[in-house]
A protein has these predicted regions:
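Structural transition elements
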Residues: 1-7, 25-34
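Immediate post-signal peptide segment of exported/extracytoplasmic ligand-binding proteins
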Residues: 2-19
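Short regulatory "switch" loops immediately downstream of catalytic or recognition motifs
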Residues: 7, 22-24, 59-68
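Short, well-ordered beta-strand elements
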Residues: 14-26, 50-51, 77
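A mature extracytoplasmic/lumenal domain signature
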Residues: 22-24, 54-56, 154-156
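Detector for C-terminal structural segments
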Residues: 31-41, 45, 61, 65-184
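Short, well-structured beta-strand/strand-turn elements
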Residues: 44-60
């Protein structure tokens, strides 16, 4: 990271400064302030100063829905929003498909990349689960290679359950169905 920053003209005497919109809580976020401070410390170690604009969850969502091109976002470099990743659209396509820019979608940064668009269209039109996995792997690889996101947590929702609990099915998303659950 330091090498890339130096190549871009940044270093100890000229630090890269970024402003990030974050929230204090909401929508199942684990510990957003503590986690963002951890990220801030790690970025500082390579010479990047992160400044946070802290807002409540609903304000952050409204800010996100306006997109990076909105006048209110002019001084911001990034936004930190937690998202469920229960399906291909929620996990990938809504963030990198150029058809999903605000106000229609969640492509806050207005990413416009023909390869992402091609892969997103392919994913939408692929019914075979094995083939879909291959396309999604390509989207994920490109997202990592292009560094369009800084992924910093995958909440696997650790929990402990009594052996007396019967019928519980661990959900694939944030939505828990307690209707089949019994105790005894």
């Amino acid at each position: 990271a330091k090498k890339l920053l130096a190549e871009a003209g940044y270093g100890p005497q000229k630090k890269l400064k970024l402003k990030v919109a974050i929230s204090t809580s909401g929508s199942g976020q684990m510990y957003p302030l503590i986690m963002n401070e951890f990220i801030q410390q790690q970025f500082a170690e390579v010479g990047v100063d992160l400044e946070f604009q802290v807002m409540d969850w609903n304000a952050l969502l409204n800010f996100m829905r306006q997109g990076a091109k909105a006048p209110e976002a002019a001084s911001f470099s990034a936004i930190n929003v937690s998202w469920n990743t229960m399906d291909p659209h929620n996990a990938f396509m809504r963030f990198v498909d150029s058809q999903q820019v605000p106000p229609k979608g969640s492509n806050w940064g207005y990413i416009n990349d023909p390869e992402f668009d091609k892969l997103a269209a392919e994913a939408r039109n692929t019914a075979d689960p094995a083939e879909l996995d291959k396309v999604l792997a390509k989207i994920n690889t490109r997202m990592v290679d292009e560094a369009v996101f800084v992924w910093f947590v995958h909440d696997v929702w650790p929990n402990a359950i009594s052996s007396k609990l019967k019928g519980y099915v661990h959900p694939k998303s944030w939505y828990v169905d307690f209707s089949p659950v019994t105790v005894g």
